[in-house]
Amino acid sequence: MRRTLIFNAVLCLPLLATDARLTPEEREKAIGAMKTSQQDYIEALNNVTEAQWKWKPTAERWSVGECAEHIVLAEALLFGKVQEAVNSPANPEWETKTKGKIEFLEKVMPNRLGKAKSPLEIEPKGNMSKEEALKLFRQGRVQTSAFIAETQVPLKEHTAEHPFPVFNTLSAYQWYMYIPWHTMRHLKQIAEVKATEGYPKD
């Protein structure tokens, strides 16, 4: 009898494991965040003049144009990390390695908590026009939005490493959510630039 109970318990273990697939709620959360951040990005840039695009509060701070350029560059890099994770073998320790990080990302990224130096490959050069930024942003979002709406990959069990120790291992889903939340973070930065004394009126 004891052996039978143990055997049955072992058989049930896989059924008790957390499902690595997205729940309908998680997929909807991602789609909603992408839609909101896309609308907000376009609205933030729509009426910006060339003078406003290039104006910098200080030599060290980014202009509206540089923030917008950084967002475009970062979205491409971040979706590349999603693809890197998806193309990697499933991580058997994904639950332990990624636990609590979606909540942490949602807390620190959109709210601009913590400061970090941007990687060189996504530092703005200051030579991207508003029209180019909007075009590249929209093009990138066609791909990223279609991905999350259609994918059946169990995104949570595929991981890729973040260069910042505070994040370390992130799942493909967490890397994906990084995209809209990072954009929201820098849209707040754009709002700060616009609210700075000396920002051109036109």
Give the residues covered by each predicted segment.
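Sec-dependent N-terminal signal peptides
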Residues: 4-13
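Hydrophobic packing residues in well-ordered alpha-helices of helical domains and bundles
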Residues: 34, 133-137, 176-179
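N-terminal targeting signals for Sec/Tat export/insertion, comprising classic cleavable signal peptides
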Residues: 27-55
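Amphipathic, well-ordered alpha-helical segments in soluble domains
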Residues: 37-44, 74, 78, 115, ...
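Amphipathic alpha-helical packing segments from all-alpha helical-bundle domains
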Residues: 139-150
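Short, helix-capping/interhelical loops that line the mouth of catalytic, cofactor-
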Residues: 16-29, 80-137, 161-167, 197-202
